[in-house]
Amino acid sequence: VFSNLDQNNIEAKVIPDSKENNEEKNNPRYLFTDVDGLRVRYTDLGFGDSVVLLLHGFGGDLDNWFFNHDALAEKHRTLALDLPGHGQSGKTIHDPSLSGMATFVSNFLDVLAVPSVHVVGHSMGGAIAMQLLLECPETVKSLGLICSAGLGPEINSDYLRGFVEAKTSHELKQVVQQLFADESLATLQLIEDLLKYKLSEGVEAAL
């Protein structure tokens, strides 16, 4: 689910959102830029020299941080993005390695002219955050990990396989409930949103 990028060829621009639905187009929270040919959706809230970057997990998107955005933005500039292959970002992906994603995140920050960040990563996003720290230590001012991947050899392959292969809301719900101690939190709206993402063009191949 990651992109192989040339760090010497980065173009920054806001792309008109002509292909999104009306709700997306009219939502000022969402911005779009281009990182070496890949369309990226992101949010940029708050102000100041202290910048927080939020990295979501596998199968998620920047809206996983919806209830954190405004609270963090009260005291920090707060960035979140749809990682390659996720959300409304591009689905053409060439490098599925952690190193490839760390490079992508670094290039994304270069596009926004952000030299350093406090990184918070969840699940896969945590593993990417740690890789970013290893490869670009000058970029990471602090590291916050939430249920991070990469801290041990265990990988829940049944969950990953089930998420990728689920074709219906019923199948997907059985998988997503594994993420919650209280299974009732896997709401119908959550399942429908995830299924809509999974059925989007290019997602199956990206995952």
Task: Locate predicted features.
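Conserved HGGG/HGGXW glycine-rich cap/lid loop of the alpha/beta-hydrolase fold
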Residues: 38-88
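Alpha/beta-hydrolase fold catalytic core
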Residues: 1-52, 73-76, 114-115, 145, ...
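Short, hydrophobic alpha-helix immediately C-terminal to the catalytic nucleophile
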Residues: 66, 106, 130-134
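Active-site loop/oxyanion-hole signature of alpha/beta-hydrolase fold enzymes
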Residues: 29-31, 35-43, 79-124
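A short beta-to-alpha transition loop/helix N-cap that caps and shapes the active-site region
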Residues: 87-88, 149-156, 183
